[in-house]
């Protein structure tokens, strides 16, 4: 569409506020529609009786349109695709303005592209997550997928699009280090998540590996070692999980920090994602350890 002139990709970054507003409205609309549909069709799940709480947390667990699980579809197909398109839009704007794309903006295109790829190619692992099998599809999840993730995790992209490259220029060795660290962190994140999810599927007898590109090495463990807890849960102690308790969280946060660091140190705004995500991961660790 961009090459044909039908749609300029720079419009996303140029009209960032308008796109964000539409996404917010869509988040509210889908939340209300999903809630009342569940109530009227008697498909509610674990209701408290308090409207505000139930609307926020959700009424339906896994609403569907035909064979499509809306919660699973919205978790990947909306937020990460939008975030990747915002990064591409920022790169296109720099190319139009300067005649080149800075290594910093190219870094964000690579980073968001890798994350989108990891989520899309590993969709068979998503049903194993807490978000899918326990959390309901309410305002908290819907609004965050429609507006929160794509329009807050992109602050470094917006910052670089609004400021000259001199504000966030690094030396060549620094770029090499940051790119290398991103790729290593993503490898650990992607492969450790795959190890955990496929281990669970191995125990359930449901493992079916998809060979979507790229499949990182060490993503599927053969005869993995694990501990059996008093509560009957099996804890993986093989692969990345033999070295630390939360390799996926550590690598995921490293990526988040790099997303901010690539925009330099003149503003704290690009670091919003890493600070927010640290709070989220701290809460998740507490929840996991309690379980």
Question: Model segments located where?
Answer:
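Hydrophobic transmembrane alpha-helices
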Residues: 1-125, 132-197, 201-220, 227-291
């Amino acid at each position: 569409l961009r090459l044909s002139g039908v749609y300029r990709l720079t419009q996303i970054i140029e009209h960032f506020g308008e796109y964000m507003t539409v996404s917010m409205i869509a988040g509210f609309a889908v939340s209300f529609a999903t809630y009342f549909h569940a109530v009227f069709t008697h498909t509610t799940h674990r209701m408290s009786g308090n409207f505000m709480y139930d609307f926020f947390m959700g009424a339906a667990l896994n609403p569907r349109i035909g064979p499509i699980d809306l919660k699973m579809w919205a978790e990947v197909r909306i937020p990460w695709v939008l975030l990747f398109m915002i990064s591409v839009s920022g790169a296109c704007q720099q190319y139009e303005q300067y005649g080149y794309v800075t290594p910093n903006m190219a870094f964000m295109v690579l980073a968001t592209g890798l994350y989108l790829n990891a989520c899309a190619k590993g969709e068979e692992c998503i049903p194993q997550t807490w978000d899918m099998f326990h959390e309901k599809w309410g305002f908290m999840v819907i609004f965050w997928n429609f507006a929160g993730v794509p329009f807050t995790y992109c602050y470094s992209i917006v910052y670089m699009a609004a400021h000259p490259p001199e504000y966030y220029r690094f030396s060549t060795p620094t770029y090499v280090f940051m790119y290398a660290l991103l790729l290593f962190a993503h490898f650990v994140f992607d492969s450790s998540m795959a190890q955990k999810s496929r281990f669970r599927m191995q125990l359930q007898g449901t493992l079916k590996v998809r060979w979507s590109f790229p499949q990182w090495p060490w993503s599927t463990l053969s005869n993995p070692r694990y501990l059996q807890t008093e509560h009957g849960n099996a804890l993986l102690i093989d692969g990345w999980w033999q070295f630390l308790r939360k390799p996926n969280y550590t690598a995921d946060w490293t990526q988040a920090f790099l997303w901010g660091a690539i925009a330099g140190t003149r503003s704290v705004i690009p670091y919003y994602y890493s600070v927010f995500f640290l709070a989220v991961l701290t809460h998740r660790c507490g929840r996991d350890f309690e379980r």
